[in-house]
Amino acid sequence: ADYRPSKTHGQFLAGCPDIVLNTRYIWVSNLSYERYRSWLKFLAEYERSVKSKSKGVFILEVNEAVGALRKERGIHNIVWKDMVGRYDITMFALLLLSEWKKPDIYKQYVAELASALSADNARLCGALSAARLELAENPQQCLEKQCEKLDFPPPPAETSAKAVWEVQLKVLFPITEQFRQQFTGRYGSQIERLLPLQAVYGEVFDEPGTVELGTLKYLCDLGKLAVAGEDLRGLVLFHKTRNTLAHLQTVDYTDVEELLR
């Protein structure tokens, strides 16, 4: 007859008060559903039988959808998608980038890219964040490279391009509007003398602060506004950025770098 021990593995380990297991965290990753069930049985036996005040803590990472998880004594179920969202992933990326010697707005841009392109996958987000400048310069190429390293299937190029556009809209559009407000404030007296102004699409501007970038650039091209060279270069860049995003296209990195200085 086969030898059958009187105690299961869980019961035996629970009855050993001085083993190192009682002071450790044990993280078991990439479990299939079947392996998860086996571990769950072991942990249930261990939890019921342990006598020590100190006991091991087991973390089971299941890589498959397991449906409704059983509730066992001493076992807490954490469903990743219910606990960790885009905000958490973005904060994670910002933390990883916190010591990078770049302006805060630049670090925010790279963190938003890492978060959006990772589709809330923390491992991929971490890898993308670690790439730093490579991610900023060529998001698609960097994404494909990191997915290959981690053995993750890369998303379709259209999906990642849309994610990059959304990040640029989120980060670049507010600073574009900020520039417009500063420009109209700085040259308000000149603009006021030209009012009312009519834009290409028929919109009429009665106040300096409402004039949009296209009209401001048009006035400069006609020589009707005398502005500093740096302000004119900024106007051209921000107008180009606004138009690019408005046409659902992504801004080139050379322009992004200039915008985020």
Locate predicted features.
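Conserved P-loop NTPase mechanochemical-coupling segment
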Residues: 1-6, 22
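Amphipathic alpha-helical interface elements
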Residues: 9-24, 32-52, 62-240, 244-261
